[in-house]
Amino acid sequence: MEIGASTSCFYPLETEKALDKVISLDFKTAEVFFNSPCELEEPFVKQMRKNADAGGTKIVSIHPFSSNLENNCIFGEYQRRYDDFIGMYQKHFHAAALLGADIAVIHGALAKQKRPLPEEHYFERFASLVDVGRREGVRVCQENVVNFRSQNIDFLKRMKKY
């Protein structure tokens, strides 16, 4: 078993400083929780990777800063918004690959919607994220989060079968 830490543990410390904190605490496994689009730029990401490697820390996963937007921007019905956001998630997945991480964790859609959201729509959108992640060698993982669809184990079972 490996024990790791997420940079989110040190919020609102800037992500690179939070990673340095994880490294200085001698964690050998880490998650990077991005907090801003500028943190997805290659020079920034490569420097974090360099720091982690120098400290003997392996970054295994990332978490997009836009978790609170996934409900409307990835899983919502407005196609143009989805088209824009899928590009942002591609940048997250590319950053994950640069960091050596092969997992990207998402929250997904809220359990209670103002408008009904068919499960098939959710599953198709998630599958599209999986495809984009796969191109970067990254597995997109659904985190089970209270108040989100993923809080329901039966939903997750249906999602797995889809």
Where is each model-derived feature located?
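N-terminal pre-domain/capping segments
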Residues: 1-97, 101, 134
